[in-house]
Amino acid sequence: NPYSVPDLYDDMLNTFSPKKNAAFEFCEAEYFLAYKDNKVVGRIAGIINKRANETWNKKEVRFGWIDFLDDIEISRALLDAVAQWGKSKGMDTIQGPLGFTDFDAEGMLIEGFDQLSTMATIYNYPYYPQHMEKLGFEKDADWVEYKIYIPDAIPDKHKRISDLIQRKFNLKVKKYTSGKKIAAEYGQAIFELMNEAYAPLYGFSALSQGQINQYIKMYLPIVDLRMVTLVTDAEDKLVAVGISMPSLSRSEEHTS
């Protein structure tokens, strides 16, 4: 499919490994494959995020990384396997597609099938949500992805408002040229801020210290720092962070 971006296999294997993924501090998982005529025709992961369940006062088993051929019996068997596993663990609801945390790809595409996917989002065929509806699943939330075109120059009005806000609240915009330096000085603060800002988001569970350490080590030394902006207040406390990255979708296509 020309619009689908494949997973990075090493990254996916690390995500599934209790030895490599710090989310297993508060998650457990089980993985299932569906076979037909001795061929793999579907896959699914079952996940119990204990921290999220405690936060939202639920007993949910999550399903994620679901893929299947266009056969309702295959999708039914996969979801039944996760549901039964969750039930054996005391869960009473199944929900997904979700990952271990919000840093994993989530949701199911219901429109925009002719748009190039990204490495951080899920692409699926139109029959996927049709199967969900036939199996009695109901949509619980909408996530919308936007494409924004950036002008060559910042409009004067935007710049004036930015300058005014910075002066009024004594804010400072910080840029770095060293990944190790930004990790050492603000790595912990970046993820603590994310925990605070993301707390109200759908299904969110706060990152543990183990996860924070893992993400600092994984991401901050390699991101393009020209696309990372920090904002601090008068006391040098981090109050905002913006992280962007160039699209790797076309490059990812050549890894499959």
PLM feature spans:
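Extracellular structured ligand-interaction cores
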Residues: A29, E60, A141-W143
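A general structural signal for short secondary-structure junctions and capping/turn motifs
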Residues: A22-E25, W85-K87, L135-E138, D163-I165, ...
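Active-site/acyl-donor-binding loops of N-acyltransferases
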Residues: T101-D152, Y219, R226-T229, A234, ...
